[in-house]
């Protein structure tokens, strides 16, 4: 029994001289979650809800001579589509989708461009949106309806964009080009 008391006493003494252990603050953070429940036959792919398109670089010589840069694909992917079961209230299965692009910053004219809103901006240039057949998209008006494949749960809506000289008589100057557009889908 005396031996057990010595062990207990030694343990008690060692606890007196042991430094408390604290968890070091090795970083912390906060996560914000955002989502939306929609009533539609398809979901927009998460990467295409808030999309960034790199239009690349174009020289002032090229854009002032050709009046635009090279075109870049602007695809909107739809996922988890259930087209045969969707009628959008019409009684007929959904087979098409209309897309309307718009912006609060656009040039004037018959087919406005998205205005360059960059702080270190190039002048005399905007961004043109085009449909899959290279037709100009009129901002604020529905683009031609696109056919949807009822047998597929995934769809890709093809569009294009490029930097375009606003007025062919006024040279574009060098600098950044930034423009923003919103889009709304209308299933039919």
Swiss-Prot record:
Record-linked Gene3D superfamilies: Fimbrial-type adhesion domain (2.60.40.1090)
Chief subcellular location: other
Family that this chain belongs to: Belongs to the fimbrial protein family.
Xref: PANTHER family: FIMBRIAL SUBUNIT ELFA-RELATED, FIMBRIAL-LIKE PROTEIN
Taxonomy, superkingdom: Bacteria
Keywords: Disulfide bond, Fimbrium, Signal
An annotated GO cellular component: pilus
GO-annotated biological processes: cell adhesion involved in single-species biofilm formation
Location of this chain's protein in the cell: Fimbrium
Residues spanning the signal sequence: 1-23
Protein name as it appears in the record: Uncharacterized fimbrial-like protein YbgD
InterPro entries tied to this protein: Adhesion_dom_fimbrial, Adhesion_dom_fimbrial_sf, Adhesion_dom_sf, Bact_Fimbrial_Adh_Pro
SS bond list: 42-81
